[in-house]
């Protein structure tokens, strides 16, 4: 009985997040209120507030959903590309992350812009950055890359700038056409880090 209740609760939270995602993408994060999400989902106010106290909490869970989704793609990629050179694999993983085209990346670009005006979002960004870089560092280590590839922040800033440019400046087509240069930049950076390690 308790497990069934938890499953239903998780389903409700997912439904609320999907409604919130729709609102965020249509209105922007800063302009979306709890009332907007409640209206979008058609659930009672108490039902929504039972699961989420704020749109920031919803955004956090959406970002965690995005990380989970990205991790599943990485696991699948690694299972099918074992024969590739370690640098090529890491380059593919990072380039794929930077140039992904989906609603969660659009949402992440909104999040990156909004965090400059919201302390809670900045804190969330730092938490997500730490979590993501630790996971990607572990993957790099498993591939045999000895350097700490996120130590100076360059790759994080480079990837985030590509994401924001893709969404805000409509640079995605250009980046897709020139993807090999983006990948080569990341690979060369990692190789140079290893040489200087």
PLM features: what roles do these ranges have?
Residues 1-11, 196-197:
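N-terminal intrinsically disordered/low-complexity leader segments
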Residues 2, 15, 19-57, 61:
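Helix-turn-helix
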Residues 53-57, 61, 82, 99, ...:
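Residues in soluble alpha-helical coiled-coils and helical-bundle/repeat scaffolds
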Residues 61, 75-102, 142, 155-156, ...:
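Hydrophobic alpha-helical connector segments
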Residues 64-70:
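Short, basic, alpha-helical segments at the C-terminal edge of helix-turn-helix-like DNA-binding modules
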Residues 86, 98-123, 168-172:
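Amphipathic alpha-helical segments used for helix-helix packing
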Residues 94, 108-112, 159-163:
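Short alpha-helical scaffolding segments that buttress acidic/His motifs in well-ordered protein cores
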Residues 122-126, 130, 141-197:
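Hydrophobic/aromatic-rich alpha-helical bundle segments in the mid-to-C-terminal region
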